[in-house]
Amino acid sequence: MVLIRVLANLLILQLSYAQKSSELVVGGHPCNINEHRFLVLVYSDGIQCGGTLINKEWMLTAAHCDGKKMKLQFGLHSKNVPNKDKQTRVPKKKYFFPCSKNFTKWDKDIMLIRLNHPVNNSTHIAPLSLPSKPPSQDTVCNIMGWGTISPTKEIYPDVPHCANINIVDHAVCRAFYPGLLEKSKTLCAGILEGGKDTCQGDSGGPLICNGQIQGIVSVGGDPCAEPRVPALYTKVFDHLDWIKSIIAGNTAATCPL
């Protein structure tokens, strides 16, 4: 089964399409408190997602994490014992690619958010660089998030978990995900032997390769971390011109909400 990797409460989720959700980092380890200064915890209408700060006023997450009441937390490590420099924001504007929220499981699952107020860089807050080039096959990349750490049970950690996975040949994902186009704007990433994966609650978080955000957690298998079932990540490099154009003030090609 294919799952969008979000965490919902007992309310019925009203997304652009309805589908059972799933995604936290399985098979990882607690992240070091200083290795995720760009990581954002997103709460929206009962959904938990991740996100990535890309400059003091802008962040990226998945389009399917959208909701009416979004709360964005920066500089967070322990949810139970927040850092003193934690900052909370809400969206000023949300941008979808390209001028539509009608994304599919394989396409357009990206949202660019302008914050209501810029965040201040601090000990636990700093942006992550946008990609200078796309990652090649077999590149080792890092995943992280507060998602479930069990592939079959909802066990959510107090601190984000991290794991290393690899960029996988897109043909492997096309074999598992029916309808995935050869030129889809996605990255296929995981461990073919299984055991490490994003999972429920990790949606919208970053896939980091060589110190740059290369992917956004989008869709994965159910259960998570199964052998030969990599997850799909929205490919940030393929949306780079759009991202830079919006940040520069050219909103003609999209619709702010």
UniProtKB/Swiss-Prot annotation:
Expressed by the venom gland. Gene3D superfamilies: Trypsin-like serine proteases (2.40.10.10). Pfam families: Trypsin (PF00089). PROSITE patterns: TRYPSIN_DOM (PS50240), TRYPSIN_HIS (PS00134), TRYPSIN_SER (PS00135). It is found in: Secreted. The active site is at H64, D109, S203. Residues 25-248 form the Peptidase S1 domain. InterPro entries: Peptidase_S1_PA, Peptidase_S1_PA_chymotrypsin, Peptidase_S1A, Trypsin_dom, TRYPSIN_HIS, TRYPSIN_SER. Residues 19-24 form a propeptide. One of its GO terms (molecular function) is toxin activity. Monomer. Snake venom serine protease that may act in the hemostasis system of the prey. This is Snake venom serine protease KN1.
